[in-house]
C-alpha cells in the first residue's frame, strides 16, 4: 500500500489555511480527480483538489484532498457532503491536519478474518485503538464476498502499534483461526519490484528477446498454457477456484504466452496464461490473462507491471472484473 496519505494529508495546512483544507475518505474506486473537484466546486470555489493514487500501480486509494479558497466554504462542504452516498460508498469529509512523524506508517494489513465480517464490523473491531482514517475489505470480484483480508489506516502510528499488540494472533468472534495483524508493506520496498526493474527496465531488455532466469524462480505449470485463439469474448472471474485472474491490456500484436510467463513468473506461482487472438489472423487482439494462485503475489505483480512499457506499448494491468472483453 502506498503512503500517499501521509505525503499529502497536510498540503498548506497551517494556521487559518488549515480550516480550508479537507480530507475526503471512502471515495468510489472509479472516481476521477476531475469528478472530485466538480463535486466540491458545487459548494464554493476550490483552490485545489487532489485524488491520492498508489505510487506504483496508479490506481485510486479511495481518498483525496480538497482545498477551498475560504474557510466558510470548507465548513459548508463538511456540513453538506459528509455522509453523502456515492455509488456503494458513503464518503467522509473532515478537516485535514498537519503531517508529522507520529502519523506516518500507520497502515495495517489484516488477514484471516471471518468471511462474514463486513467493513463496518472490521472498523468496529479496531476502532477502540484510535481514529480510523480509512479502511478496505478485499472482496471476491465474482461473489462480492469477503476474502478475509482488510487494510486499516489509523490516525497515528502508535494506535496501529497498539492494534498489532492486541490483535495479532487473536481469534475474533466467529473464527476458529487466529488473525494476522501487521504493518502493510510498501510495494516500493519489495524485492520483487527491484527484481523486475533489473529484468525489464534495462536498456537491452525489450519485447521479443529471450530472458534468462534461474529456473527455480518460476513456479509455472506448462499444462496451464492455453493456446485457444478463437475466443471472441471471455469472462474469466477475478478470482476463480484456481486462483486470481489478472487482465493485461494494450499488448502488441506479436505478444504470446511466453512473454506473459516471463513477466509474471518472478512474482510467484502462475497457473495459467492466455493471450486472446484474432480468429482470422491469429494475432494478439491486444489483451490477455494470467492466473496466479496467491493474492499478495498477484497484487504485487499488478503494482509493478501496470504502466510498464513493453515495446512501444504502455501496459494496463489489473485484476479481472466481471465484464467481458470482446
UniProtKB/Swiss-Prot annotation:
Effect of residue 221 to A: Decreases phosphorylation by PRKCD. Nearly abolishes phosphorylation by PRKCD and translocation from the nucleus into the cytoplasm
Assembly and interaction partners: Monomer and homodimer (in vitro). Interacts with ANP32A. Interacts with ZNF385A; the interaction is indirect and mRNA-dependent and may regulate p53/TP53 expression. Identified in a mRNP complex, at least composed of DHX9, DDX3X, ELAVL1, HNRNPU, IGF2BP1, ILF3, PABPC1, PCBP2, PTBP2, STAU1, STAU2, SYNCRIP and YBX1. Interacts with AGO1 and AGO2. Interacts with IGF2BP1; the interaction is enhanced by SEPIN14P20 peptide RBPR. Interacts with IGF2BP2 and IGF2BP3. Interacts with HNRNPL. Interacts with DHX36; this interaction occurs in a RNA-dependent manner.
Function: RNA-binding protein that binds to the 3'-UTR region of mRNAs and increases their stability. Involved in embryonic stem cell (ESC) differentiation: preferentially binds mRNAs that are not methylated by N6-methyladenosine (m6A), stabilizing them, promoting ESC differentiation. Has also been shown to be capable of binding to m6A-containing mRNAs and contributes to MYC stability by binding to m6A-containing MYC mRNAs. Binds to poly-U elements and AU-rich elements (AREs) in the 3'-UTR of target mRNAs. Binds avidly to the AU-rich element in FOS and IL3/interleukin-3 mRNAs.
Species of provenance: Homo sapiens
Residues recorded with modification Phosphoserine: 2, 100, 158, 197, 202, 221, 318
Post-translational modification: Phosphorylated by MAPKAPK2. Phosphorylated by PRKCD. Methylated at Arg-217 by CARM1 in macrophages in response to LPS challenge.
Residues found modified as N-acetylserine: 2
Chief location of this protein within or outside the cell: cytoplasm
Annotated protein name in UniProt: ELAV-like protein 1
